[in-house]
Amino acid sequence: MTPEHLPTEQYEAQLAEKVVRLQSMMAPFSDLVPEVFRSPVSHYRMRAEFRIWHDGDDLYHIIFDQQTKSRIRVDSFPAASELINQLMTAMIAGVRNNPILRHKLFQIDYLTTLRNQAVVSLLYHKKLDDEWRQQAEALRDALRAQNLNVHLIGRATKTKIALDQDYIDERLPIAGKEMIYRQVENSFTQPNAAMNIQMLEWALDVTKGSKGDLLELYCGNGNFSLALARNFDRVLATEIAKPSVAAAQYNIAANHIDNVQIIRMAAEEFTQAMNGVREFNRLQGIDLKSYQCETIFVDPPRSGLDSETEKMVQAYPRILYISCNPETLCKNLETLSQTHKVERLALFDQFPYTHHMECGVLLTAK
């Protein structure tokens, strides 16, 4: 695979290899055949980041080869949304001959939605001033004249200039209901929107008929919490990043959801609070003991769950675990399988043509 060519004819073979690999990794814990969720074969990534290479009068997007570290010119990127591909061409054309916009530009980040909204961030090794803003506004207007629904942002050290706004609102059809998700630039969002829809619908399916409340750690912008709220009496969710918490609060209101409470704290701190190890001012007015959480949902970073959180989640009758790294999932399962058994197993092909696998497991207490 090269950045400008996807081996779409190999899609089925690479997916089959992942299924075999996941089954092999999960064999010590389950003999289930994974439920398999396919990605679109191209244009599946809703966000992408590129370094910008200056070559005389020319400049272009590049990425670095992960093995050799050599740079690779990228003029089109079929893994990314069609809108990102349009914007890549339009941004280079708009910046190339503009000395103010191109000077010390070193990176461009793209974030798009299924409804063709975009936020494009230009990153600089220089101070941004009013002259930069004027030129950026002219570029934005020129892009919009091409029917590109785009918001531009300039970034430099300790500086962020959003010409209009620094977010876009994604709308996803989830099990017969449209969900609105505010996505803020430079914050985590699920990169593959089609796969995100399938993950959310799978999570809804495996939690059908749930009793009591749901606890979620690492909730981000509320991606899972809000979709799952319809299956539970109440949802209590934690997140540490301020922009994500703000987006989650917006999403709660935008979706008219009244049974989700977001707390800004790390999973490790929340574990301490739940265990009564220490008190937190941020929890004033929230009666943790009033929640009857029968299910806990975790979607941890690649490092997986730390040992304290492992112990904490074992206290819950049901654990729903979405993993972006099956190796750390299996490491966690060495502990979790002492008290819980795997009831459902899913493979989500988040990043086709790569080694990467995303998977989901539902665990129930033995």
Curated annotation (Swiss-Prot):
GO terms for molecular function: rRNA binding; tRNA (uracil(54)-C5)-methyltransferase activity, S-adenosyl methionine-dependent; tRNA binding. S-adenosyl-L-methionine binds at residues 190, 218, 223, 239, 299. The keyword rRNA processing does not apply. The active site is at residues 324, 358. It catalyses: uridine(54) in tRNA + S-adenosyl-L-methionine = 5-methyluridine(54) in tRNA + S-adenosyl-L-homocysteine + H(+); uridine(341) in tmRNA + S-adenosyl-L-methionine = 5-methyluridine(341) in tmRNA + S-adenosyl-L-homocysteine + H(+). It is an enzyme of class 2 (transferase). The keyword Iron-sulfur does not apply. GO terms for biological process: tRNA methylation. Transmembrane segments: none annotated. It comes from the Bacteria. Disulfide bonds: none annotated. Pfam families: tRNA_U5-meth_tr (PF05958). Its EC number is 2.1.1.-, 2.1.1.35. One of its GO terms (cellular component) is cytosol. Keywords: Methyltransferase, S-adenosyl-L-methionine, Transferase, tRNA processing. Belongs to the class I-like SAM-binding methyltransferase superfamily. RNA M5U methyltransferase family. TrmA subfamily. NCBIfam families: trmA_only. Dual-specificity methyltransferase that catalyzes the formation of 5-methyluridine at position 54 (m5U54) in all tRNAs, and that of position 341 (m5U341) in tmRNA (transfer-mRNA). HAMAP family: RNA_methyltr_TrmA. This is tRNA/tmRNA (uracil-C(5))-methyltransferase. It comes from Escherichia coli O6:H1 (strain CFT073 / ATCC 700928 / UPEC). The gene is trmA.
